[in-house]
Amino acid sequence: MSTIFRLQLGFPGESFPFLETLMPNWAPDGVLSPDKYLALVTLHGTIMVFFLLTAGLSGTFSNLLIPLQLGARDMASGFMNMLSYWFFFLSSCIMIASIFVEGGPASGGWTIYPPLSALPEAIPGSGLGMTLWIVSMALFIVSSLLGSLNYIVTVFNLRTKGMTMTRMPLTIWAFLITAVLGVLSFPVLFSAVLLLMFDRSFGTSFYLSDIYIAGSALEVDGGSPVLFEHLFWFLGHPEVYIILLPALGITSEVVATNSRKPIFGY
């Protein structure tokens, strides 16, 4: 996906015949159309940041390593783990399905700023594909919250006898802090996409004000796209650490074990 739009970025206007063979509706004459270019950037950013780096690092390794390194038989709630997995699976299916709907997938960039995301008819990717993006992200957030709560409860309640908080491996500390950051920040993004859905479907104007299309003013007033930016980046800034901390925790254990030297100061 990233290779396709980077080819067009590196060689603007250049025709690549294999693109026409691979995706004839997206790249007529071997040149990726502008709206499909934006759609690929949006999908790539969303999948990499949320579905791979967030769920892949935190979700996968937390479930594997937290019980193993704490001496617990399993996670605190197997039922919550199951719900988290199936919400994530459903979210992934909906995100992939958005590629095949009329108008194509969401095309507002992975940050989905209004007004492109708030007006269903703004651009081809603002239609059903954008709606599916919002639904997919809402389910992903529910999955992330269920998993994070499970990790926190497991760390606090299921440590083996004699393992105090100060004796936990740094990997577990990284997963714990990541889970706390997720519980504090993901609900804000959930509220942001919920209000965005209201703007799209129910005629509200949380993010819309003084919008003109083809010289005609829309009947929306009182909102501001900046509100969405504030809500989105309330998650966006902690998201950096949600992505980074699990990798740092794992690296600290791998380096300390293979160098046969304890972590300095811990």
Residue ranges and their predicted role:
Residues M1-Y266:
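Membrane-embedded and interfacial regions of multi-pass energy-transducing membrane proteins
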